[in-house]
UniProtKB/Swiss-Prot annotation:
Residues 187-299 are annotated as: Disordered. The keyword Transport does not apply. Its main location: membrane. Residues 201-212, 250-271 have a biased composition (Low complexity). It comes from Mycobacterium tuberculosis (strain ATCC 25618 / H37Rv). Residues 1-85 are cytoplasmic. It is a single-pass membrane protein. This is Anti-sigma-D factor RsdA.
Length: 299
């Protein structure tokens, strides 16, 4: 039978193999080995350099086994803490997302919703009151639109009068203005008896009861002031002028007229002072006209 490999005569002896194994162990542990043959020393130095090149950093910088175990345990503990912190952060973020979504649902709750009680408890009372008023006003406005569509103009007018007073209680300006615009539009439809009527440009922003002056565009009649009663001075002027015109005047006598618009002018000679004449019939108990005073001609 043919044998493969080296023949038995070519195999090294066991003691040489043992010596080589001991040499490799000594080089691995960086132990100093002395050889009698210089060639063996050179070979040992070459193998030691090769060992140092393969081990980087060098073996002198390697840590001990205890230090390696301590570093491994510290790394594992740090990874566990990091995982716990990430889990805590994730749970907090999930809770915030849930709360924010729930808060948004509560904030958007309206009267009649399941969460409206919680909405009323969390938010201010004015907003809750506005929600109730707006909901009631919109329901009444929808009823008014139905009355207009059916031609019930009188009922729609009465309902609009009630809604107009209710809208003013809304504290939110934007929501109140929206309701006012709807009320004005329905007022226009009721006044014109036209379900398809629209708001006229320049219509008032505040709602008024249908048919009232504030909600109509008909021009108002001009205001006529009552005549003022004549003053005593003006009543005395006709009697004085009548007395002067009826009295015979000579040709040489110049007619003198006192102008009421210039009271500061001095009377000419022969004129009559109005203050000396009686003012009206109330000062004459007999009810007769005042006696005429003769005017002497001027020379």
């Amino acid at each position: 039978m043919r044998e493969f490999g080296n023949p038995l005569g070519d195999r090294p002896p066991l003691d040489e193999l043992a010596r080589t194994d001991l040499l490799l162990d000594a080089l691995a542990e960086r132990e100093e080995v002395d050889f009698a043959d210089p060639r063996d020393d050179a070979l040992a130095a070459l193998l030691g350099q090769w060992r140092d090149d393969l081990r980087w950093p060098p073996a002198s910088a390697l840590v001990s086994q205890d230090e390696a175990v301590a570093a491994l345990r510290a790394g594992v503990a740090q990874r566990r803490r990091a995982r716990r912190s990430l889990a805590a952060v994730g749970s907090v973020a999930a809770a915030l997302l849930v709360l924010s979504g729930f808060g948004a649902v509560v904030a958007d709750a309206r009267p009649g919703d399941l969460l409206y009680g919680l909405h009323a408890m969390m938010f201010n009372r004015s907003r809750v009151s506005d929600d109730q008023i707006v909901l009631s006003a919109k329901a009444n406005l929808a009823k008014v639109e139905q009355m207009i569509a059916q031609g019930q103009w009188a009922e729609a007018q009465d309902e609009l009068a009630e809604v107009s007073s209710t809208v003013q209680a809304v504290t939110d300006g934007s929501r109140r203005q929206d309701l006012i615009n709807e009320v004005n539009l329905l007022n226009t439809k009721v006044e014109t008896r036209d379900p398809n009527a629209t708001l006229r440009p320049g219509s008032p922003s505040n709602p008024a009861a249908p048919g009232s002056v504030g909600n109509s565009w008909t021009p108002l009649a001009p205001v006529v002031e009552p005549p003022t009663p004549p003053t005593p001075a003006s009543a005395a002027e006709p009697s004085m002028s009548a007395g002067v015109s009826e009295s015979p005047m000579p040709n040489s006598t110049s007619t003198v007229a006192a102008s009421p618009s210039t009271p500061s002018s001095k009377p000419e000679p022969g004129s009559i002072d109005p203050s000396l004449e009686p003012a009206d019939e109330a000062t004459n108990p007999a009810g007769q006209p005042a006696p005429e005073t003769p005017v002497s001609p001027t020379h």
